């Protein structure tokens, strides 16, 4: 299954909520009417079955983190093997992805841009270049923009945008050095309340 490269607004409209796929340079405006489904006239949102609700929640989370279906299912299986609540474990695995940590630290304006930085070898972890977006960052790891990429305008622009939103508590960023420490894996209370991971567990448990 290929990665989606079409309009990000369309995905937010499909899920009926802002998936934060845009940079935040401008808010989702009247041109992106997330209250109506995609289509020239906006498809009517019918009443969903229990399965439909579970599927939509899975698609929403998958699209927020930019993960393809096969990989997402792999994360679920790993989450189920670990001790604790499967849904919470799933979110922790997604939050620990390198591309997501780069985004949380503000080096990329979106997770998609952060994924590009990783794949273009602009990011290091503990001093070593890592170009795998799914790399699992551990507590205490130092994530930094490599010297060759520090002058990229898009990185400085992303940091400026990040300064306009509230900082997350589980990363500590030095904007001058363009590096940060992943202090800990976030707890469930740290993450968005509008994600219902239990619906995903119910979907995959069938």
UniProtKB/Swiss-Prot annotation:
Pfam families the UniProt entry points to: Ribosomal_S4, S4
Q: How does it assemble?
A: Part of the 30S ribosomal subunit. Contacts protein S5. The interaction surface between S4 and S5 is involved in control of translational fidelity.
Please give the InterPro entries that the UniProt record associates with this protein.
Ribosomal_uS4, Ribosomal_uS4_bac-type, Ribosomal_uS4_CS, Ribosomal_uS4_N, S4_RNA-bd, S4_RNA-bd_sf
| Keyword annotations from UniProtKB, A to Z | Ribonucleoprotein, Ribosomal protein, RNA-binding, rRNA-binding
| Name used for this protein in its record | Small ribosomal subunit protein uS4
* Domain of life where this protein originates: Bacteria
Native source organism of the sequence? Cellvibrio japonicus (strain Ueda107)
A GO molecular function held by the record: rRNA binding
Question: Which residues does the UniProt record annotate as the domain S4 RNA-binding?
Answer: 96-158
Protein task: One of the primary rRNA binding proteins, it binds directly to 16S rRNA where it nucleates assembly of the body of the 30S subunit. With S5 and S12 plays an important role in translational accuracy.
GO CC annotation terms, alphabetical? small ribosomal subunit
One GO biological-process annotation of the entry reads: translation
